[in-house]
Amino acid sequence: ESAIEQEVFGLEMGYGLLVLADNKKGGDLLDRITGARTNFAREMGMLLPTIGVRDNIELEPNEYRFLLRGKEIVRSSIMPDRVLAMSMGGGDASKLNGIPTIEPVFGIKAMWVPDEERRNAEVEGCTVVDPSSVLVTHLADVLKREAHLILEREGTQRLLDLIKDKNPTLVSELLPDLVNVGVIQRTLQNLLRERVSIKNLTIILETIADMAAVTKNPDDLSEQCRKRLGMYFVKEYESEPNKLLS
């Protein structure tokens, strides 16, 4: 069964990066990945499957890559024995003695420098992070970017089950008479594709229920959900009617 069932999302690393995941050597990468999954669920409202982490001898020692259903979607590298000094906040990493690179998420010019150069980098005004932070930040960005492809029928059903525990009337109104799970999945995927959080799932499902008599097209439904969510988002930031906080 395990041979048939394909892993949804995975991380593969070259052997030089394994020290980052070895807690006996002070590596906390696995804990950070768990934290990234938790933060993603809290921010985007989507339950993530377990992220498989393994070594791959075909990668260069300091390389890593993310896979979606077994297919590589991005590859990068970090230096486990150095820290990354980035040209942020007015700092200029090019003045430092190190190995030049580009930070993978923000595209910022950066320099891999020995840890003993951290203080000098900070004096130069650079932002300095450890290699595990670079990888986990990259992971978080990729998860958001690919969330719509990660969400499967089963994951959608799990979200519906969570809502059903608190709001059984809403779910029973929707399923199976108004729409099926596939329509809800594709509607949620449309929102996630635009990096719209689905954590306000009750509002989304209520909108689908309201509109289902008119249209069952996921594109139309997601557009209406986006508008409804936008109304609630604005209200959160209003200090008084029709006036946004400055």
Regions found by a protein language model. Give the residues of each.
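Membrane-embedded alpha-helical signal segments
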Residues: 1-246
